[in-house]
């Protein structure tokens, strides 16, 4: 696990009904902002909203927010252009090659409170077994038999 992830403050988990509602809002909004786009292969949601541990952090919060964020993984064609409404997230570094660490964030994406983090994985990298292994080790569901809990939000196929 990345070092900064170990230093999170305590979190008060929201009731499941609230998590489900917020998660559905985030899924609908990400789809409305990104689709249709022929260069998007798959959109996957991972993290606390899928594991039912989404909630509010004790001050000072984590990554500039008092709340959990929504973690989307986008598998895209190699020539996909990352949308301008997303800002680069310098802390998202699961891969040793920094050119592959395409982590982006949009602050207050849902209800003016909850951030979205979007991590892009280019198709040529997604098909590389060594990169699949690194991604899986970092908690990213890279393969169809991944052990990591996730929701497939969209798939081109």
Q: Can you describe what each PLM-predicted range is?
A:
Residues 71:
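Cell-envelope/extracellular polymer assembly enzymes that use nucleotide-activated donors
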């Amino acid at each position: 696990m990345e070092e900064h992830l170990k230093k999170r403050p305590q979190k008060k988990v929201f009731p499941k009904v609230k998590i489900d509602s917020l998660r559905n809002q985030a899924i609908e909004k990400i789809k409305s902002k990104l689709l249709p786009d022929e260069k998007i292969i798959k959109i996957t949601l991972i993290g606390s909203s899928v594991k039912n541990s989404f909630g509010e952090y004790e001050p000072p919060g984590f990554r500039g927010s008092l709340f959990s964020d929504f973690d989307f993984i986008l598998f895209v064609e190699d020539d996909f252009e990352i949308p301008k409404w997303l800002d680069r997230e310098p802390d998202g570094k699961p891969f040793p090659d920094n050119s592959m660490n395409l982590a982006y964030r949009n602050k207050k994406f849902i209800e003016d409170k909850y951030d979205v983090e979007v991590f892009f994985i280019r198709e040529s990298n997604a098909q590389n077994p060594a990169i699949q292994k690194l991604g899986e080790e970092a908690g990213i569901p890279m393969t169809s038999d991944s052990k990591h809990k996730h929701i497939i939000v969209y798939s081109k196929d």
